[in-house]
A protein has these predicted regions:
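Catalytic binding pocket for nucleotide-activated donors in carbohydrate/polymer assembly enzymes
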Residues: 276-277, 281-332
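A donor-sugar binding/catalytic signature common to diverse glycosyltransferases
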Residues: 109-113, 130, 260-300
Length: 364
């Protein structure tokens, strides 16, 4: 008998969607029936990738944070300004989820940092499986990086996902977690990318939709305008009309061409998002990263430098950029050695071994 799985995915940035597409593709090979809980913003992507899978629309609650945890006052202000009844929205989802499998509820709930399906699992006393990369922040050492503490990220995890039947944690870097039956650390959950012959003059720049901080992104672009010895392919949801005059800058929207562009570039300039860093490592691509004011990004950038996978932008100037470019070959060798040392198994095999043992989910 097929297991009925309700899977919910966050839509902030592109990392959650990219990761869940990989997981859904693997689950489709198994003895399961899937229903997806996705937002209006992301449903187009899921519909294009999985037209045969039923989808339930959700609205994701947004919690405002400050450095020591949740900012309840700002969260209240934002909630009032949205003029949407979040509880009513959840109940509408729950009514549909309760009978989403031809009148039957799911057997198992899976979530990638999505709260609606989590609350539903708790209310229905269903097994909840977390499939994300943020859960590692519950277990890694407590510290502060550049004035940003881990308290914010941990507060969100405790607020949304205080308890899980199992946590699969995707991580591009090694993490020392005390062995627990309900936790499995996976090699990064990424798609299989094909590496092409390198174009040494081509650099991909990725601006995550996570931020609208134009001032920060323009700092990066200002640094690039002087480097006419390279061609920069810039992916962004924002328009930068003042920079379109530079012939060595090409602007694109994130889409199908992104995979082709990173397959042959010589390096990537990006925010320190876990998913893209992981994909770059899989292709031996050095990273020059800037960070958003979150502990997760600060920690990812710290790991990039610790293992010599690239460099963090601090000054946004030509001297620092030159230092990065002059060491590309060193970074490539370090990335290759790092991957061979730490990525010794396949994420899908590790995940499915656990799913089979605990829940009877297996490839058909």
């Amino acid at each position: 008998m097929k297991k009925r799985i309700l899977l919910g995915a966050n839509d902030v940035g592109n990392g959650h969607i990219s990761r869940q597409k990989c997981i859904i593709h693997e689950l489709q090979k198994c003895n399961v029936e899937l229903v997806l809980a996705v937002t209006e913003k992301s449903i187009v992507q899921y519909e294009a990738a999985f037209p045969e899978i039923k989808k339930i629309r959700i609205n994701i609650p947004w919690i405002q944070c400050e450095n020591d945890g949740i900012d309840f006052k700002e969260t209240l202000n934002r909630y009032r300004n949205t003029k949407m009844d979040q509880f009513e929205s959840f109940l509408e989802f729950a009514v549909e989820a309760r009978q989403c499998f031809d009148g039957c509820p799911p057997d198992i709930v899976m979530t990638d940092f999505e709260a609606n399906v989590t609350w539903f699992a708790y209310a229905m006393d269903l097994p909840l499986i977390c499939l994300d990369q943020q859960s590692k922040l519950l277990y890694i050492g407590e510290e502060e990086i550049d004035g940003i503490t881990i308290a914010r990220d941990r507060a969100l995890l405790r607020f949304y996902f205080p308890k899980a039947d199992h946590r699969f944690i995707s991580s591009f870097y090694p993490i020392d977690i005390e062995k627990k039956e309900e936790i499995t650390v996976l090699p990064p959950v990424i798609r299989n990318l094909k590496k092409e012959k390198m174009d040494r003059s081509k650099i991909v720049v990725y601006f995550s939709p996570f931020t609208n901080d134009v001032k920060l992104l323009e700092q990066v672009l200002d640094m690039l305008t002087e480097r006419t010895d390279y061609h920069f392919v810039v992916y962004s949801k924002l328009d930068f009309k003042n920079y379109e005059q530079y012939p060595h800058l090409t602007f694109k929207r994130i889409g199908e061409t992104f995979e082709n562009d990173i397959s042959d570039c010589c390096c990537i300039l990006s925010s320190a998002g876990h998913q893209l860093i992981s994909e770059a490592i899989s292709l031996d691509i050095p990273l020059y990263v800037f960070t958003f004011p979150t502990y997760d990004q600060k920690y990812c950038a710290k790991m990039v430098e610790r293992y010599k996978l690239g460099k963090t932008m601090r000054r946004f100037d030509q001297i620092e950029f030159d230092d990065f470019l002059q060491n590309l070959e060193l970074y490539r060798r370090s990335i290759s050695a790092f991957r061979k040392k730490y990525w010794t198994s396949s994420w899908d095999d590790v995940m499915l071994d656990v799913l089979n043992e605990k829940y009877g989910i297996h490839r058909m």
